[in-house]
């Protein structure tokens, strides 16, 4: 389990050395890979022993244990290095492969990681396809299940759900029936205690108009006044004497 976790961590790593990137060649690529700062390089391998003893790479075939070899070259960009365990000069078991592209070292994924990644992508795509297909399925009691691929159907369902959410939010923000009635009662009480002033123009409009004969009389009087002008009313003196009383014979 720990080795599997370490392998997955190495798949996310990359390494490069800017000092030697420009001078890579089939003769120098192994020295570039075997630098101590490379996290993919195991310092307990046979390559390190050969380097410390200043021997040539051909001596690796006569040794037993872990070693790194140059497997494939595609100059000047790609180099493939294999990590393997040598049992004898003619037999070795591959452990891992590393590739160098443009001076950057990566670990190549093994077959299990490739299969797991492909299966995961397939499952995710199938799940999204089933979810998309289920959104077009419709059920009717008489017809059963049918497909409805009208483009507006899904959008209309989404708009309806959005409207329902908006209405529910409005209902939550509005007050209860008791609160509304209570506010109306308080407003009516305040209006009764503090009535607003009525303008004079509205007071004249509120006076009842003259009824029937009084209205006609008022109209005739106004017409006569307009036609003849103002009338002079003569008044008699207040000192007039009453007629003498008749005496009985």
From Swiss-Prot:
It is found in: Nucleus. This is Mediator of RNA polymerase II transcription subunit 6. One of its GO terms (biological process) is positive regulation of DNA-templated transcription. One of its GO terms (molecular function) is transcription coregulator activity. Belongs to the Mediator complex subunit 6 family. It holds the Pfam family Med6. Residues 156-177, 198-249 are annotated as: Disordered. Keywords: Activator, Nucleus, Transcription, Transcription regulation. GO terms for cellular component: core mediator complex; cytoplasm; mediator complex; nucleoplasm; nucleus. It comes from Drosophila melanogaster. Component of the Mediator complex, which includes at least MED4, MED6, MED14, MED17, MED18, MED20, MED21, MED23, MED24, MED27, MED30 and MED31. Component of the Mediator complex, a coactivator involved in the regulated transcription of nearly all RNA polymerase II-dependent genes. Mediator functions as a bridge to convey information from gene-specific regulatory proteins to the basal RNA polymerase II transcription machinery. Mediator is recruited to promoters by direct interactions with regulatory proteins and serves as a scaffold for the assembly of a functional preinitiation complex with RNA polymerase II and the general transcription factors. Required for activated transcription of the MtnA, MtnB and MtnD genes. The keyword Nucleus applies. Residues 156-173, 233-249 have a biased composition (Basic and acidic residues). The gene is MED6. Residues 217-228 have a biased composition (Polar residues). InterPro entries: Mediator_Med6 (IPR007018), Mediator_Med6_met/pln (IPR016820), Mediator_Med6_sf (IPR038566). The keyword Nucleus applies.
């Amino acid at each position: 389990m720990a080795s599997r976790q370490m392998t997955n961590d190495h798949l996310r790593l990359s390494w490069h050395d800017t000092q030697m990137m420009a001078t890579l060649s089939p003769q120098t690529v192994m020295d570039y890979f075997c630098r101590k700062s490379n996290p993919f390089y195991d310092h307990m391998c046979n390559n390190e022993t050969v380097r410390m003893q200043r021997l040539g790479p051909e001596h690796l075939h006569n040794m037993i244990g872990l070693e790194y070899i140059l497997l494939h070259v595609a100059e000047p960009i790609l180099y493939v290095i294999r990590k393997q365990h040598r049992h004898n000069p003619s037999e070795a078991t591959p452990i891992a492969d590393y590739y160098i592209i443009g001076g950057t070292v990566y670990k190549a994924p093994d077959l299990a990681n490739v299969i797991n990644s492909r299966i995961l992508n397939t499952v995710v795509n199938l799940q999204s396809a089933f979810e998309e297909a289920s959104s077009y399925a419709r059920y009717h009691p008489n017809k059963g299940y049918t497909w409805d691929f009208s483009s507006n159907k899904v959008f209309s369902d989404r708009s309806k759900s959005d409207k329902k959410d908006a209405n529910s939010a409005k209902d939550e923000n509005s007050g209860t029936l008791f609160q509304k009635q209570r506010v109306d009662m308080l407003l009516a009480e305040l209006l009764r205690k503090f009535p607003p002033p009525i303008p004079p123009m509205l007071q004249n409009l509120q006076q009842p108009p003259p009824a029937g004969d009084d209205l006609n009389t008022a109209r005739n009087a106004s017409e006569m006044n307009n036609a003849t002008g103002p009338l002079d009313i003569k008044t008699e003196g207040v000192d007039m004497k009453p007629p003498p009383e008749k005496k009985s014979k």
